[in-house]
Each structure stands twice: as structure tokens, then as C-alpha cells.
């Protein structure tokens, strides 16, 4: 089964909170320090248990000689560095951590570049350029490796609200660079919490380390809490669940419209355009409408983010002038593709699991079709050969 980490950022996310969460979930601090020592930077990880509104959490501070760490959700005033300096430091890490950490700072540079109108090479990092952020981002990547996490899921992110003071003045929450990084990520702005809950470092962790946003079906092994610095109206902690994927639950939408006055030749093109735009599924259902008029119900499954784009295509490429939108929860069983050796050669087979049991085995159609044509045997014989072989090794799939 696939080992996953599910993040519940009900109080946002910052670099130190993520590090605290990883340690709380079982990362060995000494091994983490050992891996990060390759950066060639002198630092100390101060780790302690704290209480946030009745919740015990792990607090991690990155401390440098002569300088106290003070990252929190509020303060943005850190010393600055340019991207080239940071890249030279990160190059000392071992792969795959090196590759991912450098990608994360590239992403940060692009966000800052867009906000300030500068080439990314000339961006002067503030909160994200401080050496503690370098340690936090490198530590985030290394920590996930140490936990053996294969995929990271995340729920909707609370950004907080109000204004934050920066070197450039008072900015609305989320700050501009953070907002840029949060594009495509499901967020909500809690008006009851007048504080910055997501820092740029936290935002880039979400952007680059989270594989999917949505609620997975998982078997929980551990629950951990990483603490932030300031005290808020709510517990200032990042909660995470470490466990194994049993299935996946996604929040999708179903768009439907009934069409009774369109040239049938246009339906094929409409389907192509909907898939090109990002539809997850498109299907047509013959129906009878009022006055016994034959029609076609067009159904489109897509993500919430694609809704407006799908509706635009639907209205432009069909005669529809209205549509129904339904919010759905879709559950997927985890699956993997294995290769099965038969008398006709190797054939890819999709195996689905639920509750740790194999619930479905499906040979890949296109591969079976190709072999059937090449060997000049019935397609059903290829399928039968696969099923015979699978029955012999059923306990090993």
C-alpha cells in the first residue's frame, strides 16, 4: 500500500510548522541534522513540545550563531539573498532532495519576480531568502524522504485575513508573493482570524510538495502537530495524518444540459473540445423531453477549477443556453499497473485495491488489441490468457 501524508492546514502553514509536524510524526532530528549539514551552513535545530490552545505540538526553531530564529505568520523582515547565492548552497544536498529544493526556490523566485517586476535573477529575497528558510525548505524535502512518504495530500488551506506589515508597507493577507504561489490551490480566508496564516515558505511547500488537493481515504497510523510561533484565536498548529492510502475522495462537479435542436454531427466535435478543455469524463444520454421531443443530455464531469472553462465551451460549441451544476464526491480505489507474462508476451494489467484487498483486475485494452492483431488471434483469447496467468499468481498481485 502507498504511504501518504495528509495535511490539514486549518491554521495555515509555515516552514517551521511543517518541520515541526515532520518531527512530531517520527523524523529523527539527529538524522535530519546530519543530512542538512551537507549544506555547509552552521545552524542548530531547537526542538521542544509546546501547548497551543490545549493541543500539544512540536516546535522547531532554526537558530544560527548570534541570531535567534523568529519566523512566524506575521513578520516578514529578514535579511536578503539573491537566487544564485541560495542555489550554490542547495547544490550541496544529495539528490533527489537537491533537485526538489532547487525547484522550490526557482518557484519562489518566479513568484517574487512577477510581483516586483524584476528578472528572477535579481530578486532580493526577504522572508524566503533568509537562511532559516533555506534550512526549512531543504528540511521539508529531506524530512519527507526520511518518513518514507510516497505522496502528499492536502485539504483546503486557511490563509487568514487582514493585513501584514512588510518592508514595502502594509499588504493584504495573503501577501502578493504568497497569493501568486497559491494559484490553483483551494483556499479560504477566515475572517475571524486577523493574521497571516500562510507564509511564502509555507506556500511553496504546498505548491511543490503536495501531489493532490482533496480528501483521501486512508488508514491512519499517526497524527502529528507542528507548532507556529504566535498565539492566535485558534490553535496555531499544522495537523498531519501519516498513513496508507485506501482510496481517494475528490470533490468534482457534474455539468448537465439538455439539447434538442442541434445538428447531430456537432456532438462529436463538442466532446473533443470538452476533453481538450480539461473534462474528466463526457457522456451523452438519449432522452425524451416535453411534447415527446427526442433530445440528448450532455453530461460533463470536471474539477471545480475547470467549471467556467467547460461552461464556455458548452455554450460556444452547442445550442445550449443554460446548464445544471451538481457538486459531487468521487471515490477512487487505489490502483497500480503490473506486467503479466503470457504465452503471447507481456501485457500490462491494471490492479485495483480496496481495504488492502484486490477488488478488480483489468487487462489494458489497447495492448491486448495490438497483440491480437499481431498474432492474428481473437481478442478474447488474449484476455483469457491474462486471466489464466493472474489466477496462477493471485496472491502476489
Curated annotation (Swiss-Prot):
Its EC number is 4.99.1.12. GO terms for molecular function: lyase activity; nickel cation binding. Keywords: Lyase, Nickel. It catalyses: Ni(II)-pyridinium-3,5-bisthiocarboxylate mononucleotide = pyridinium-3,5-bisthiocarboxylate mononucleotide + Ni(2+). The keyword Lyase applies. Involved in the biosynthesis of a nickel-pincer cofactor ((SCS)Ni(II) pincer complex). Binds Ni(2+), and functions in nickel delivery to pyridinium-3,5-bisthiocarboxylic acid mononucleotide (P2TMN), to form the mature cofactor. Is thus probably required for the activation of nickel-pincer cofactor-dependent enzymes. This is Pyridinium-3,5-bisthiocarboxylic acid mononucleotide nickel insertion protein. The lineage of its organism: Bacteria, Thermotogati, Thermotogota, Thermotogae, Thermotogales. The gene is larC.
Amino acid at each position: 500500500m502507498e504511504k501518504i501524508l495528509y495535511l490539514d492546514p486549518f491554521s495555515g502553514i509555515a516552514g517551521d510548522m511543517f518541520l515541526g509536524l515532520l518531527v512530531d510524526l517520527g523524523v529523527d532530528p539527529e538524522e535530519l541534522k546530519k543530512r542538512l549539514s551537507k549544506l555547509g551552513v552552521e545552524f542548530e535545530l531547537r526542538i521542544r513540545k509546546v501547548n497551543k490552545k490545549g493541543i500539544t505540538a512540536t516546535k522547531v526553531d532554526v537558530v544560527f550563531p548570534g541570531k535567534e530564529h523568529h519566523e512566524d505568520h506575521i513578520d516578514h523582515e529578514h535579511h536578503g539573498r539573491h537566487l544564485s547565492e541560495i542555489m550554490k548552497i542547495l547544490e550541496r544536498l544529495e539528490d533527489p532532495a537537491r533537485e526538489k529544493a532547487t525547484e522550490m526556490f526557482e518557484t519562489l523566485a518566479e513568484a517574487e519576480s512577477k510581483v516586483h517586476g524584476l528578472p528572477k535573477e535579481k530578486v532580493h529575497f526577504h522572508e524566503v531568502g533568509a537562511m532559516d528558510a533555506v534550512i526549512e525548505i531543504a528540511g521539508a524535502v529531506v524530512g519527507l524522504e526520511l518518513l518514507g512518504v510516497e505522496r502528499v495530500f492536502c485539504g483546503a488551506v486557511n490563509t487568514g485575513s487582514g493585513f501584514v506589515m512588510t518592508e514595502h508597507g502594509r499588504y493584504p493577507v495573503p501577501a502578493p508573493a504568497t497569493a501568486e504561489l497559491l494559484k490553483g490551490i483551494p483556499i479560504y480566508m477566515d475572517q475571524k482570524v486577523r493574521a497571516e496564516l500562510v507564509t511564502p515558505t509555507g506556500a511553496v511547500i504546498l505548491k511543490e510538495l503536495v501531489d493532490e488537493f482533496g480528501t483521501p481515504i486512508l488508514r491512519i497510523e499517526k497524527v502529528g502537530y507542528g507548532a507556529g510561533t504566535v498565539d492566535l484565536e485558534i490553535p496555531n498548529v499544522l495537523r498531519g495524518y501519516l498513513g496508507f492510502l485506501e482510496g481517494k475522495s475528490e470533490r468534482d462537479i457534474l455539468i448537465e444540459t439538455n439539447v434538442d435542436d442541434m445538428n447531430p454531427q456537432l456532438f462529436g466535435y463538442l466532446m473533443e473540445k470538452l476533453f481538450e478543455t480539461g473534462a474528466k469524463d463526457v457522456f451523452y444520454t438519449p432522452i425524451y423531453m416535453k411534447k415527446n421531443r427526442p433530445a440528448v443530455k450532455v453530461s460533463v464531469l470536471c474539477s471545480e477549477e475547470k467549471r467556467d472553462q467547460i461552461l464556455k465551451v458548452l455554450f460556444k460549441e452547442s445550442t445550449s443556453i443554460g446548464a445544471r451544476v451538481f457538486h459531487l464526491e468521487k471515490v477512487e480505489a487505489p490502483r497500480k499497473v503490473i506486467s503479466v507474462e503470457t504465452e503471447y508476451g507481456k501485457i500490462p494489467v491494471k490492479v485495483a485495491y480496496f481495504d488492502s484487498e484486490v477488488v478488480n483486475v483489468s487487462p489494458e485494452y489497447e495492448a491486448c488489441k495490438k497483440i491480437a492483431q499481431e498474432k492474428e488471434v481473437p481478442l478474447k483469447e488474449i484476455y483469457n490468457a491474462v486471466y489464466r496467468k493472474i489466477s496462477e499468481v493471485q496472491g502476489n498481485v
